[in-house]
């Protein structure tokens, strides 16, 4: 009888041991590498999915060895998303804190900003600097345009969204603008981009929604008149087609770009799609991320 009890006890111990092993296997060590795609954000569902989501998907696919995380920088957008739609998106500091707590050691941060402006520097670079001691490695990738060589690449990518243009037709691109941009060593980004489109022989006028920046809407109107366009296709030179695109660019208000251009007798055609859904633009961000991971950033 004692022998039977001993065998039963041994069997029970083996079952418990196997259960413990199974539990340990289920909790196998997680991946300690992550890629964080950080964007300004948007409350517009379509553009958040296709533009921001398009870049996120491309980057995540390029780094299958890294767990993907999303972060936004606009607190107003994050608050509205959570309050009105029940969508919770963390800012970059919170995302990095959670990654640290979860045991991640190698972090790649890919911003979806267009240039080294205030948003990129104050919301991304400054934040990452504060977390450099919390990970074995954390690197930040470049925005879309960094130096002179990027303009032709970016312009060619953006141009893939343009329709076939007829005689008297042109394209108007509305960028956001940045006070920091005016101090760039290589000159004003938007003016340089304009020169690039001109050299490519494309009928494009580039402007910024910020009136204090340049080229502003007045300069855009002057260019449309000087070039003699009868019809202009309007696109946001922004990752998302959000508030600026839907209201400032192509809204029905008297001071929208659409209204001001139509007052000149020029027909407008709106294309409310951000450049984030553009596969060629996505490819540029992926290239920057790959370079950052390899430690060959400019």
What are these regions (language model features)?
Residues 2-23:
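Sec-dependent N-terminal signal peptides of Gram-positive bacterial secreted proteins and lipoproteins
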């Amino acid at each position: 009888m004692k022998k039977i009890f001993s065998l039963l006890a041994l069997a029970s111990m083996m079952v418990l041991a196997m259960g413990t092993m199974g539990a340990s296997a289920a909790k196998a060590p997680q991946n300690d590498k992550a890629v964080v795609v950080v964007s300004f954000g948007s409350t517009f569902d379509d553009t958040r999915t296709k533009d921001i989501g398009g870049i996120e998907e491309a980057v995540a696919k390029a780094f299958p060895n890294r767990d993907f995380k999303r972060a936004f920088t606009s607190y107003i957008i994050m608050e509205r998303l959570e309050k009105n739609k029940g969508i919770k998106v963390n800012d970059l500091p919170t995302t990095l804190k959670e990654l640290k707590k979860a045991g991640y050691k190698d972090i790649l941060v890919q911003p979806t900003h267009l240039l080294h402006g205030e948003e990129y520097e104050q919301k991304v670079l400054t934040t990452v600097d504060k977390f450099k001691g919390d990970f074995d490695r954390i690197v930040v990738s470049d925005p879309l345009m960094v130096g002179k060589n990027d303009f032709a690449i970016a312009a060619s990518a953006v141009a893939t969204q343009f329709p076939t243009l007829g005689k008297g037709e042109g394209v108007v691109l509305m960028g956001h603008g940045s006070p920091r941009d005016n101090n760039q060593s290589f000159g004003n980004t938007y003016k340089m981009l304009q020169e690039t489109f001109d050299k490519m022989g494309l009928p494009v006028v580039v402007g910024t929604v910020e009136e204090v920046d340049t080229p502003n809407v007045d300069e855009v109107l002057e260019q449309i008149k000087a070039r003699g366009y009868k019809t202009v296709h309007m696109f946001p030179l922004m990752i998302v087609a959000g508030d600026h695109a839907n209201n400032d660019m192509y809204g029905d208000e008297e001071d929208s770009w659409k209204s001001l251009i139509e007052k000149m007798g020029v027909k407008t055609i709106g294309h409310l799609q951000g450049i984030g859904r553009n596969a060629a633009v996505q490819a540029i961000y992926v290239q920057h991320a790959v370079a950052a991971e390899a430690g060959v950033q400019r």
